[in-house]
Amino acid sequence: MRTPRLVTAVLTAVPLIVAIPAATAGATAAAADSAPVAAAPQIPPPVHHGTLRIAGRPRDGALVTASGVAWHAPRLPRGMKLLSFEVAYTWQSCAPSGRRCTTAAGSTATPFAARQFRAGHADTGRRLRVTETAAEVVQTKARNFTFKVLRRSVSRLASVPVRAYRRHQRPVSYFRNGTPERHTASAEEYFGVSSPHYNSADGQPSQRYRVDQGAWRPMPANHVFYTGKLAVGPHQVSVRTANRAGSTQIQFGWRVVPLPAPLACQPRAGQPCWYPPHLAANHKPMRWDWQIGLTTPLKRTGKRAVDMYDIDGFLTTRAEVAAIQTRWPASTLAHPKTICYLDLAWEDYRPDASPPGRGGLFPAATLGNVYFGYPEERWVDFRQLDALKPMLRERIGMCARKGFSAVELDDIDSFDPPSTTGFRLTPGDAQNYLAYAFNLIHADGMTGLWKNSPLLSWWGRKYSDGAVLEECYTYHQCTAAQLRGSSQYGITCTGLSGATPCGWDDFTTDKTAAQPNGKWVGDAEYGDDHFVCNPGQTGAKCKGQHSYAAFCRALYDPPLGFAAVKFDVDLDGRVFYPCPRGA
């Protein structure tokens, strides 16, 4: 389960404006529909000039461009702040009548991306339609410190007929779904290739590929091929497309470089790095609280003092971080430490969401599919590390400037299937990206916490200093023994003594000079899944659920010693049941 976060209504086009409070973080679409809806002030729509048209020669294989409209954000009333302004393009293939439209093959449909589109063979004789949508994301703030995120968009349409590929012209193909950067530490890659562009009278083309100087192989039916494991050094892939009209060949070359070694945490301004220990001074798991779905100020845990607060890096101010670390009560420390929560995904309500040139840090080509259930978020192409380094440096640097002790990186499992992410990424792509991110955290004087992603945890342990888990108890994925035999993406989990121990006891037993009793692991279970009862609940209220005492015995008690807590999925400070009961 993914970390709960901000969910708001998407305001489309015209006068209807609805906002859901930010505290609905993590809710499903159904839950969002049933959430209390607050009346929102009217926000002016995006401003545009000109008429949308499709420029270029619309035929099979041709690159066309949506153009003719200039957009800009409107002047906003006082009390409103523009968070991001985006222009998105969706391409559709329609019947000659202009009806019965479906998303065109190869349409990326990413925010402020896909302004250009290459018509395909399947579009011949049909109409190509583009929808250009400008959307603004605006924040309002009230006197009680609550805030709402509002969205409003305006769309324009244009369409053209698509002509056939020229007769007797050699067929062509193109790389799609992106390619790795020219230098990467990933030793394996997937390459997507477009269906051939050709004239039917010249015959159905064949496609073949090869890696380096290897044998030519038939292209798989899904037009995606895998390089296999590659050695450090230069590499090249080639694709050949041929029919009676002739043949063409495309190539892509890049260099695999060694993965950077883990960097030790560098003291900042004379202050030593803080490493979260497996067990605190009282020989028990170090207690923590997690508040990132905030619409109100941070809540102290009062008598249930904790040693660590995991809080939103953007929403929390430097003054709040200082107050927590110098004045708030703690459990075993003088004062609590603070963890800076950062999402590695694109979130449209963050101040860096706009593309470069508009005050943001996410190039259009790096954005993929929408997160399921989280329409305000997009997957990010981890292959494009150099393009995303400015974003990582700024976000992690923000945590350091605010005085955080550690950083939690969320959404690191970017090698999910392409149907989920929009990219064909490998575990090696994730390792290349995350090695840079965690080393950057250490270079800025903070420690780093791994998040979920058990298939890579055995590797991530070398670069990180602890872990945050979600519902490992619910899904029976806490220990190396529970995960043993799990296999995906070429990774097979072994037991704790094997080469790839995917369990989190691999962290707690990892004893280093900085963490002599192992690395801290915190687990969050959520009440909305009805898997663990609340403390003191019995009978009908707990029918079919595990008791709170059993949950604590399994995770908090030896030998695991996880800092186990039951939260509400909103993570807004209202629900906090740490193990053991009464703590």
Task: Annotate each PLM feature.
Residues R2, A31-A32:
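Short Cys/His-based metal-binding microdomains
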Residues M80-F85, D202-G203, S331-H335:
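Short helix-terminating capping/connector loops at secondary-structure junctions
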Residues M1-V14:
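N-terminal export and membrane-targeting signals
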